[in-house]
Amino acid sequence: MANLRVFSCLVLSSLSVFAQSERGNITGALTDPSGAAVVGAQMSIVQTSTNATTHATTSSSGEYNAANLLPDTYRIEVSAPGFKRFVQQNVIVSAGSTVRVNATLQLGQVSESIEVTTSAATIQTDNAKVTTVVQNKLVDQLPLVVGGAMRSPFNLVAVAAEARGDGQRLSVGGGQAAQWDATLDGHSVGTNRSGDTAEAALNTPSVESLTEFAVDTNGFKAEYGQAGGGVLTFASKSGTNQFHGSAYDFLRNDAMDARNFFAAKRSVYRQNDYGFTAAGPVIIPRLYNGRDKTFFFVSWEGFRNRVGANDTILSVPTPEMYTGDFSKWVDQSNKLITVYNPNTTRVSGGLTIRDPYPGNLIPASQFSATAQSIATYGKAVAPNRGFAPGTSGYVRNNYLVTGGTQITPTDKISVKGDQIIGSRQRVSLLWNTTAFRNKPGPAGAPGLPEPLWNGQIQAWDTEAYRVAHDFTVSPNMVNHFSFAKNTFTKNSFSANVDKDWKSKVCIKNVVDCNQNFPTINFTEFTGWGSSSYNGTNQPGWGLRDDLSYTRGNHSLKFGFQYQDQHADGFGQQDIGGRADFSFQSTSIPGNTSFPNSGGSSFASFLTGQAFLGRTETIR
């Protein structure tokens, strides 16, 4: 079991409060035509999609700061006695950004107004962070390759010049691979065991549910001290006063593909990445009108695929070997490989020797009863490549698999609700869940038939919760509190679990042979079976509070953060037993150079001469 607890408490002071989670800030200064500071001006920062309003008052130096704003487009309204009303439209706040909007107020009546409709400049002048922001339009319109898995928001990281590689090789800002951190609405989505983007992506919503994200590569604050090189900041979408919805399907189908030049026919390749989103105000006719107050956002994304198996060549024992006949067991030069009787092992003249089986035939009286019960399942698989007995091709690389597939069905659901309480408070709730499976397709597994198939089924399930509360204590003081919880269960198991194996196959002295078909490995043939349940639970939770306070031309930020992450292993991999068989158990003692040594791992199996064995208790 591994766990990680991080606690940080910070106090920052500077000319402005630097945004650092998925939230942003609008800051600036107001002056009169002579350049003097305008003190006590009343400001309203309005989120245009919901009409949610944040209030601020300019300080004694004319400075203002509106902190903890969701990524969106805002309108700034300013009123002060003796000055015309000022309105700045189209102020775009990105994830983790600080936007400076300065204004010069004109003398006049408050009933008069000056309105600026052009977009405010978004150049970062208040900090030295290197940040790449991928905004909503690019998130919606950028094509992502759907290649064997659901679209991942981490695919978008490639647009940042500071990011290199992918998966466990991803590095950001020159940091080491897998040393980055990724956050969803201010809290980490990473796991305690891996910096793999595939794992972290399971704890993030669908690409369609993200409004934007940012990549910070330097200058990030103490709350991200666990990251090396960079921080990926994801912001989830919220509902607005307008109803919106979408439906989509990213399709790949072999019917639209060209045949490979050397192939006789097109390979089966079918994928669908499809889903929908719905968002808007919560309205219950005649009961409740949630415009300007209550909003929802819902999304579902599903991924289904079916890919034809590539031809795979395996090595399987021949039918006569099951009877003990190794007279056709030859090397690549078609020379007989002698099998030696382990029961004749003795010391002679200072050397350990064995006698060969006459005619390379093992008598049935030496067969292991357990081996015979296991071998029953292997007899159905015989060489199928057409090589003649007595040739190398008959005993190795002799089995062609042309069918079977692995499929990876995945479902992802995201639900978010926002409630504006009066003019000073906002509460947000987010729930995201993902179910990922990796298992054989309808035509069976791509390998030996069950129970001999040595692959595993994967079942990964995640849930991510986010709760946030924003409270404008006063025009110059804003508090943001958030809570997060992540659950991530990775489970892998064979296709043979829980099938009453005790009455069919049972290796003596294992913990529980009823749980799983045993795992059998050979040095010259494809192994049989796979391990039972095993995996990790990786729960985590965290608290965070940020208090932003503006006084004079200074902005102060106080806060604390607590993170608790665990990685708790579980499983019973070899609870049904594992046995490895080597040619050395039926070869010339001390000679490990196969095939000159003689011997056969399958002969060792028939006679019960395990080279290595193990079982495992439940953990």
Residues covered by each model-derived region:
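Membrane-embedded beta-strands that build the outer-membrane beta-barrel scaffold
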Residues: L30, I114-E115, V172, A182, ...
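Periplasm-facing N-terminal accessory domains of Gram-negative outer-membrane beta-barrel systems
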Residues: A2-Q135, N438
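Periplasmic N-terminal accessory/gating domains of Gram-negative outer-membrane beta-barrel systems
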Residues: F83-S238, H244, L251-A263, D273-I283, ...
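Solvent-exposed, acidic/flexible segments
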Residues: A36-V38, A67-L69, T132, V146-M150, ...
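Periplasmic-side early beta-strands and strand-to-turn transitions of outer-membrane beta-barrels
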Residues: T122, Y248-T410, A435-L452, T487, ...
